[in-house]
Amino acid sequence: MIFDVIKNLFKKDENTEQIEYLGVDKDGNKIYEGYYHEFKGIPWVFNKTTYTREEFDKAFYECLEEHNVNHDNLPPLVEPEILVSYEAWIESKSQLHPNEYLYEDDELEEYDKEDGMWQVDIYARFKADNGQYFTTEEILFKIHNAMANKELGDHVFFENLAYDDHEFDADDADDVSDDDEGTPVFVVWLGS
């Protein structure tokens, strides 16, 4: 009996967090709290089209089918709200949506412009439609439409949506409120 207690003590990994299994979504995907899948292998190409959700889903599923990607294997992102960081070129702050903020919100200086645009890092806040988690389709739809009115250069191929940090330093972006600490931040990686 004492041997079993000692054995179990050494089996524990102090750095391992318990991941709570939350069940399955409407499509049968397993949902876990506090675990972030890699969002790689999704062959999406960002463009200037602003989609309705129905239009996006149709184009997205056609793209997956063309590249033999099974949409049933796309993982959910189990967070009710996230911040997404991405790089883009803008002509003015008016291109930012109400849920977007510049990482460095100091004045955009004329001398920093290149071909009439500024290269900026943008944070976008997204909330899950169901209040609990994002499907892969939902988060890519929201990211796509946020980027559609901005210039991405030749970096238009989706490579990954990678977890960056769980704490957000509100001092880095003046427009982000102090209650943002604890909101997970993800970075969109695009390739050419």
Predicted regions and their residues:
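Low-complexity, charge- and small-residue-enriched intrinsically disordered regions
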Residues: 1-16
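Acidic, proline/glycine-rich low-complexity IDRs
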Residues: 3-6, 117-121, 144-192
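Composition-driven low-complexity segments enriched in polar/acidic and proline residues
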Residues: 13-126
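Intrinsically disordered, low-complexity regions
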Residues: 24, 29, 35, 42, ...
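Ordered hydrophobic segments in well-structured contexts
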Residues: 83, 138, 185-187
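Residues that form ligand- and interface-recognition hot spots within folded domains
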Residues: 86-88, 130, 143
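Short amphipathic, charge-patterned alpha-helical segments
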Residues: 132-149
